[in-house]
């Protein structure tokens, strides 16, 4: 069983390298037309240049997974902001794409919790489609739209989970097919359990990104030993291995909040279940300390008897 690792957005080890510098619409409104264009250009350029720095860092540390920041382009989906964020930065997008392809990196997006398809309000679905389209356009500009995924949660229950799931199946039909093909779903920590999310993924033929921390915060009746093989099976029609999310609770009181680092003892039960299946999979670390937490966790995990470190960020067990 081979496990490859990655982290989310910011490389904590790099100084002043945020790929998610932003600009509020309020501050945007206060500027003249030229100042708006200049500010949007400068912030986006900086985010892209920082992303390139981060990718070089990942390559140097043999980190094969990385989640791009959804905020890489400020105000990209705001209805009152017009900005050619693709055409203006074609060379930078291509540089990012070249690095990803040359080093065979697995790159993804994870829009925020407001991108959902369970609402009975049409504008919420419209906004979700707009946001998914933005993420797809960025992947396409990079040149990896046919091999990367955009991960979201199922959404809210709105007092009736059964009807909300029905709306999901109806609303998702409005998402262009080429974008839906690049979509994954994740179980959440309050509403949709692992079993419920799995059922939706199986019906829609959407790969399931399993989050172990969320699973432990929102348990279902079915044991993980039964669920995990079926979760991995949702990836069978793709040409890549399954991906899971890992983080640890901040505390017993704040169980859903992410800790700074990974608690190996919290994760061990999941790893033992995965070992019995003996299927290769990728792990996205979602701890607050990001790359630092990832590297520390790999070091701790590699000390377990039978676990072999085969590269800086890849283990075999």
Curated annotation (Swiss-Prot):
Q: Which Enzyme Commission numbers does its entry carry?
A: 3.-.-.-
Question: Which InterPro entries does the record cross-reference, listed alphabetically?
Answer: UvdE, UvdE_bac, Xyl_isomerase-like_sf
Q: Name one GO biological process term.
A: nucleotide-excision repair
- Statement: the UniProt record of this protein carries the keyword Nuclease: yes
Out of the domains of life, which is the source? Bacteria
Gene3D superfamilies cross-referenced by the UniProt entry? Divalent-metal-dependent TIM barrel enzymes (3.20.20.150)
Gene Ontology MF terms? endonuclease activity
Q: Name one Pfam family in it.
A: UvdE
What keywords does the record list, in alphabetical order? DNA damage, DNA excision, DNA repair, Endonuclease, Hydrolase, Nuclease
Per the entry, what this protein does is: Component in a DNA repair pathway. Removal of UV LIGHT damaged nucleotides. Recognizes pyrimidine dimers and cleave a phosphodiester bond immediately 5' to the lesion.
Which HAMAP family would you find in this protein's record?
UV_endonuclease
What family is reported? Belongs to the uve1/UvsE family.
Name assigned to this protein: UV DNA damage endonuclease
Q: Specify the species.
A: Bacillus cereus (strain Q1)
Taxonomic lineage: Bacteria, Bacillati, Bacillota, Bacilli, Bacillales
* Underlying gene: uvsE
């Amino acid at each position: 069983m081979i496990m490859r690792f990655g982290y989310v957005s910011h490389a904590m080890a790099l100084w002043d390298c945020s790929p998610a510098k932003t600009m509020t619409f309020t501050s945007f409104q206060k500027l003249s037309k030229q100042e708006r264009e200049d500010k949007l250009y400068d912030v986006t350029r900086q985010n892209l240049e920082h992303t390139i720095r981060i990718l070089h860092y990942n390559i140097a540390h043999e980190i094969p997974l990385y989640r791009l920041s959804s905020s890489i382009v400020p105000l990209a989906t705001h209805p009152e902001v017009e900005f050619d964020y693709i055409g203006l930065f074609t060379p930078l997008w291509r540089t990012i794409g070249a690095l990803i392809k040359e080093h065979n990196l697995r790159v993804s997006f994870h829009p925020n919790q407001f991108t959902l398809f369970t609402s009975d309000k049409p504008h919420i679905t419209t906004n979700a489609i707009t946001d998914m389209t933005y993420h797809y356009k960025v992947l396409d500009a990079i040149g990896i739209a046919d091999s990367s995924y955009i991960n979201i949660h199922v959404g809210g229950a709105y007092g009736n989970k059964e009807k909300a799931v029905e709306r999901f199946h109806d609303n998702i039909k409005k998402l262009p097919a080429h974008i839906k093909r690049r979509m994954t779903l994740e179980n959440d920590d309050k509403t949709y359990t692992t079993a419920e999310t799995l059922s939706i993924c199986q019906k829609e033929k959407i790969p399931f990104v399993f989050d172990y921390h969320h699973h432990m915060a929102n348990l279902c009746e079915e044991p993980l030993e039964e669920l995990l093989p079926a979760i991995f099976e949702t990836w069978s029609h793709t040409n890549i291995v399954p991906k899971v999310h890992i983080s640890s609770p901040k505390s017993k009181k704040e169980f859903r909040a992410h800790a700074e680092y990974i608690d190996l003892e919290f994760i061990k039960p999941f790893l033992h279940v995965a070992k019995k299946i003996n299927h290769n999979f990728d792990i996205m670390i979602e701890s607050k300390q990001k790359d630092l937490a990832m590297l520390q966790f790999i070091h701790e995990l590699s000390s377990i008897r039978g676990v072999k470190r085969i590269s800086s960020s890849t283990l075999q067990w």
